[in-house]
UniProtKB/Swiss-Prot annotation:
Originating organism: Escherichia phage lambda
Descriptive protein name: Tail tip protein M
Localization terms from the record: Virion; Host cytoplasm
Major place of residence: virion
Gene, per the UniProt record: M
Alphabetical UniProt keywords: Host cytoplasm, Late protein, Viral genome ejection through host cell envelope, Viral long flexible tail ejection system, Viral penetration into host cytoplasm, Viral release from host cell, Viral tail assembly, Viral tail protein, Virion, Virus entry into host cell
Amino acid sequence: MKTFRWKVKPGMDVASVPSVRKVRFGDGYSQRAPAGLNANLKTYSVTLSVPREEATVLESFLEEHGGWKSFLWTPPYEWRQIKVTCAKWSSRVSMLRVEFSAEFEQVVN
């Protein structure tokens, strides 16, 4: 499994949508429980800026994984790597640098 080695810009968005199973009973009572062991996986919206010559390497890395194949990434200010996929990214090309915006979705397999 490959590792995403590029540094992302500070100020990324992190979204959590816990997966919850909910049952409603006839008298208005409801019961909730987490939907499995990994019910709170996160989605990271990241931005990074790389020199133009490095942009093709980064683009190739993302294309190689194709949105379905996971890779390892260490979120900023955390000490452990997590497995993520990236099914959505875009780039803005300027004179000397290319700015990428991507969405990393945490996975367990």
